[in-house]
């Protein structure tokens, strides 16, 4: 069972890779398609996984992962438990600005199975931003795709003067401070 490491491979020229983990099915796939449709000046690789660890037999073919977005469906406790279990397979150096938690289904608060405090605690414990969205709505899905692409661009080192760690600190929740 391989642990994902952020700097174990060299970066590819004019390219960035994002790994979307969790919340199997339509919303994750639709988000990936929305990201691919956006105009960008670099190549993007999107890998989808329902959980970690990733299979090790194709590890030598997998590009360097610049950003991991853990997708949590607020309607499913299994989704949160799956993400929590997957976090054990991520090297701690990824949490220096290269991880975010994407919480979907927030438009249906009455169907909520996951406590919001658990999600906020996850973001605090792993020093990673928590992004709330509704992937079933086209406009919000496009806005989320644009936001993830900008984060990916920063995490891949394609924005001069801005590091992933610095950007992550800017996105942290300051309500508790």
Swiss-Prot record:
Pfam families: CENP-M
Keywords in alphabetical order: Centromere, Chromosome, Nucleus
Highest taxon of the lineage: Eukaryota
Intracellular or extracellular location(s): Nucleus; Chromosome, Centromere
Keyword Nucleus: yes
UniProt keyword Transcription, yes or no: no
Annotated coiled-coil segments of the chain: none
Database matches in Gene3D superfamilies: P-loop containing nucleotide triphosphate hydrolases
UniProt GO cellular component terms: chromosome, centromeric region; nucleus
PANTHER family recorded: CENTROMERE PROTEIN M
Subunit structure, as described in the record: Component of the CENPA-HI complex, at least composed of CENPH, CENPI, CENPK, CENPL, CENPM, CENPO and CENPP.
Entry function: Component of the CENPA-HI complex, a centromeric complex involved in assembly of kinetochore proteins, mitotic progression and chromosome segregation.
Name of the featured protein: Centromere protein M
Organism annotation: Gallus gallus
């Amino acid at each position: 069972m391989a642990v994902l490491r952020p700097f174990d491979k060299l970066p590819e020229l004019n390219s960035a890779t994002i790994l979307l983990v969790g919340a199997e099915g339509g919303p994750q796939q639709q988000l990936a398609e929305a990201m691919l449709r956006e105009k960008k000046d670099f190549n993007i690789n999107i890998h989808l996984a329902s959980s970690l660890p990733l299979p090790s037999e194709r590890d030598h073919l997998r590009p360097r992962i610049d950003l991991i977005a853990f997708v949590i469906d607020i309607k499913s406790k299994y989704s949160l438990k799956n993400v929590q279990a997957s976090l054990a397979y991520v090297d701690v150096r990824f949490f220096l600005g290269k991880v975010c938690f994407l919480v979907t289904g927030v438009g249906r608060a009455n169907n909520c199975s996951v406590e919001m405090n658990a999600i906020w605690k996850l973001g605090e414990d792993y020093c990673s931003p928590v992004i709330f969205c509704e992937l079933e709505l086209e406009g919000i899905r496009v806005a989320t795709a644009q936001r993830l692409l900008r984060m990916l661009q920063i995490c891949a080192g394609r924005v001069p003067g801005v590091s992933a760690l610095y950007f992550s600190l800017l996105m942290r929740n300051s309500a508790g401070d």
